[in-house]
Amino acid sequence: AWYRGRGYWLAPPALRMKEGKVRIEVPASDEWGESQCLGILPSIEAAYHMPARLQSELAERYVRMLNKRLEELVLVEGHRFGALVLEPLVMGAGGMIFVDPLFQRCLVDVVRSREDLFSLSDPPLRDACVNRDADGWRGLPVVYDEVFTGLHRLGFAMGADVLGTPPDINCLAKILTGGVVPMSVTLASDSIFRAFSISDQKTHALLHGHSYTAHPVGCQVTLETLDMLDEMPTKASWDPAWLERMSYAKRLRGIMSLGTVLKLELESSTGGYASDAADDLLRT
């Protein structure tokens, strides 16, 4: 085959409100074994209160599991990783999965603390994992893909506002122009940016570009969008009382909301994009 995947995808715990409570559920997987409920939280607000949740027993369980799984992947299975890439809080491309933010915070913390694992990589990543400035990235570069969720879609500017820890690289797109013209941005910390400027060799530069790089119309629309965001209310959300009532609906497996995003999960024997559950509901 012309392509061989080198990444590894963890099965994340997902949040689902049912009968007024937020359940933390995991699918059957190598990480968790059988599908199960890891815990129940009293409200959506409690699920995203990171300072309190970091002190919980579940945080300790996440850290133990992540350390164990990473050790298996690197030391036993021989994986070599170059970065941690995640969609903060809501995996839009994965089926609107509301990932437990505590799990993502623990994942970032563990990856940044395990230089002993990632310094085993082949050159040049081996040298890049150590001997950096005090404010540089650690373990692996952490990339937040906020193409869908960034810039107030979820009720706050960035995922780091909830997770409580910033990325080393951040990707933004959709809200920059609302899809009117092509535009995206990739933001990087100083330590990441300097990696492309310490050499005089052209091959060490970030030789990347496409037809719409620095597109002037897109750049101007983006500037106008950012000005509008500064003037608009910074937080919008669905009515909590309505969400709680809907969580008791018999046809719903669960409901979740964050900022402007609402997810209604229908009871269905089939899932994914091929499911006809929504059509069946509209016909009734």
Q: Can you say where each PLM-predicted feature lies in the sequence?
A:
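Conserved N-terminal phosphate-binding loop of PLP-dependent enzymes in the Aspartate aminotransferase
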Residues: 1-284
